[in-house]
């Protein structure tokens, strides 16, 4: 029995693995590649160039690989690359890149993108991230591994969301969020660190305590960023987790959420 519903429309140039499932009324355009074990639900639109890896599931009414609405876009060939084992829920929109950046939007592996979330052009999402319902990423946003953006989180273009960070519901992020930091509010403010997430992922208590001390250096001692980075040199040499935190601050181009 065919795994492709006869009511689906698939461009002859699209490349689908033999066991890909496609639901009714979905449209798969030219230049789309889909890896093995992936399930495309009903009423999904996939536009290329888009490469989707293995064992993904895309739910109904999602639009994946559409042209960017960026006013600079003039029809140049750009792409979307999606890795493996992602879940993309109902009504999600993901746009391809622009030639002014990498010409590519990237979604890594093992991510959960929940209903009505939006991933803008040229954004780069790592692995094991969760974008909760109605989260919206503007263009050129980077989200590192294990970050969680709660429902209705808004992220300004070019922001960098650090690994293992967490945003509360309705947070509006306009500056970079360092690794491990939790942010809340509109505009976003740093409140603490994602200690519960660290414990769930097996971080040692020693590493968690070191990060707690590092957070206080940056956010509680009234230091400038440069002064705080200097004070973190020694603990960063002892704890790789503190090094990740410090590096994410040092790499910031928009300034960090305070």
Swiss-Prot record:
Pathways involved: Glycolipid biosynthesis; lipid IV(A) biosynthesis; lipid IV(A) from (3R)-3-hydroxytetradecanoyl-[acyl-carrier-protein] and UDP-N-acetyl-alpha-D-glucosamine: step 1/6
Keyword tRNA-binding included in the entry's annotation: no
GO molecular function: acyl-[acyl-carrier-protein]-UDP-N-acetylglucosamine O-acyltransferase activity
Entry superkingdom: Bacteria
UniProt keyword annotation of Acetylation present: no
Annotated family: Belongs to the transferase hexapeptide repeat family. LpxA subfamily.
Keywords: Acyltransferase, Cytoplasm, Lipid A biosynthesis, Lipid biosynthesis, Lipid metabolism, Repeat, Transferase
Function of the protein: Involved in the biosynthesis of lipid A, a phosphorylated glycolipid that anchors the lipopolysaccharide to the outer membrane of the cell.
PROSITE patterns, alphabetized: HEXAPEP_TRANSFERASES (PS00101)
The protein, known as: Acyl-[acyl-carrier-protein]--UDP-N-acetylglucosamine O-acyltransferase
Organism classification: Bacteria, Pseudomonadati, Pseudomonadota, Gammaproteobacteria, Pseudomonadales
EC numbers on record: 2.3.1.129
Catalysed reactions, as listed in the record: a (3R)-hydroxyacyl-[ACP] + UDP-N-acetyl-alpha-D-glucosamine = a UDP-3-O-[(3R)-3-hydroxyacyl]-N-acetyl-alpha-D-glucosamine + holo-[ACP]
HAMAP family: LpxA (MF_00387)
GO cellular component, one term: membrane
Gene Ontology annotations of biological process type: lipid A biosynthetic process
Record's subunit section: Homotrimer.
Protein's cellular compartments: Cytoplasm
